[in-house]
């Protein structure tokens, strides 16, 4: 428009076709500006707000903020296997929202989480359950559960520890730990994982155990001829390629003076579950294995008595969001960020701390 003149100063009527233009910068750029005077105004492109300089600092003029939609994969630490014909550890709880991919326990994909730029949220990567060592006199009750993993309001439950001699069942967890001779596997958590496998009864000098539950399948029952296998994990493409995680640990088997072979080992479930071990009075077949780090895999059980089981694998937290945003951490977390198509993917592999988007 033509505008009006007041005391020699022309104020232009821009109309709706000529909006007032304010210089836009990122938050980092604004904080680096120099030479400002009180009343200067800029647009913060990260937070979606107008800011005015008061002579000392920049202050937001409006309450409007940008919302960030985040897809996630949150896997807790896996439970450790046990010793003394111990079962396999259960996989860490598995919760997923990306691309309609399933969560653990056969449940549907969860909803994406929405947060606001500049708002802090917590990320915690759960540790795997610590290995246990048998004493040879039947005093080991159970191995150890894994620790929970957290993204904001989303929490996944640590995998269940396994049962051990004598008469100790598997523990409940994200996925349940496998039972020891003549006991049941632990229960998995609804929407996160499956139950651990049961263990068959003693057969002479043969003692068996069940496999740990996985995010994608229950652990199998242990037999006199073979320890139970760990349950399978679940595949996700949140990082841009398909990766299977959260497999249960294989069970351990003790066969006394009977023949033993590698074929009797309880195999770890696909997705990071550790293999178990078979032992007779002369030999050990395949030393037990730990669950794979950052998969939440369960640890393998051991057939022997004065032996050490497989530790559970640590968990992982993976976040996928628009590449328009960046994530920052206040410390205490180990993570990397990669660009995948039009998104960024941040993978947290250890620690706990607060983060925010900008």
Question: Where in this protein do the model-derived segments appear?
Answer:
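Extracellular beta-strand solenoids
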Residues: 1, 6-18, 22, 44, ...
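Short, solvent-exposed secondary-structure boundary motifs
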Residues: 1-2, 27-38, 225-228, 324-330
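Extracellular/surface-exposed low-complexity repeats and stalk/linker segments enriched in Gly/Pro
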Residues: 9-41, 45-47, 62
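Short beta-strand segments and strand-loop junctions that repeat across beta-rich extracellular domains
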Residues: 48-56
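Tryptophan-rich substrate-binding surfaces of secreted polymer-degrading and adhesive proteins
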Residues: 56-64
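Low-complexity, glycine/proline-biased repetitive segments and flexible coils/loops
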Residues: 69-358
């Amino acid at each position: 428009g033509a505008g009006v003149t007041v005391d020699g100063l022309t104020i232009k009527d821009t109309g709706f076709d000529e909006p007032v233009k304010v210089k836009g910068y990122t938050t980092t750029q604004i904080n680096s500006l120099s030479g400002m005077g009180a009343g200067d105004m800029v647009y913060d492109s990260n937070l979606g707000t107008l800011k005015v300089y008061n002579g000392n600092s920049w202050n937001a003029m409006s309450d409007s903020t940008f919302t960030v939609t985040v897809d996630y994969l949150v896997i807790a630490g896996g439970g450790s296997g046990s010793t003394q014909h111990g079962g396999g550890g259960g996989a860490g709880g598995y919760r997923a929202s990306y691309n309609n991919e399933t969560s653990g326990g056969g449940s549907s994909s969860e909803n994406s989480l929405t947060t606001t730029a500049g708002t802090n949220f917590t990320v915690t990567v759960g540790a795997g359950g610590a290995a246990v060592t048998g004493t040879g006199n039947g005093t080991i009750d159970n191995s150890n559960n894994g620790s929970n993993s957290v993204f904001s309001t989303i929490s996944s439950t640590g995998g269940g520890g396994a049962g051990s001699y004598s008469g100790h069942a598997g523990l409940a967890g994200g996925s349940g730990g496998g039972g020891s001779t003549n006991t049941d596997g632990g229960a998995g958590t609804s929407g996160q994982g499956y139950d651990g496998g049961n263990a068959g009864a003693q057969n002479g000098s043969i003692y068996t155990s069940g496999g740990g539950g996985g995010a994608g399948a229950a652990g199998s029952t242990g037999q006199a001829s073979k320890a139970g296998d760990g349950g399978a994990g679940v595949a996700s493409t949140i990082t841009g390629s398909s990766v299977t995680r959260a497999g249960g640990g294989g069970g351990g088997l003790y066969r006394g003076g009977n023949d033993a072979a590698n074929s009797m080992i309880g195999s770890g479930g696909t997705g990071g579950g550790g293999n178990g071990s078979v032992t007779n009075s002369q030999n050990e077949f395949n030393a037990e294995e730990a669950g794979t780090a950052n998969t939440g895999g369960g640890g393998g059980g051991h057939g022997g008595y004065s032996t050490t089981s497989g530790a559970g694998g640590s968990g992982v937290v993976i976040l996928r969001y628009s590449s328009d945003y960046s994530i920052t951490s206040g410390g205490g977390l180990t993570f990397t960020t990669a660009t995948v198509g039009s998104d960024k993917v941040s993978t947290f592999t250890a620690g706990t701390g607060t983060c925010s988007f900008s």
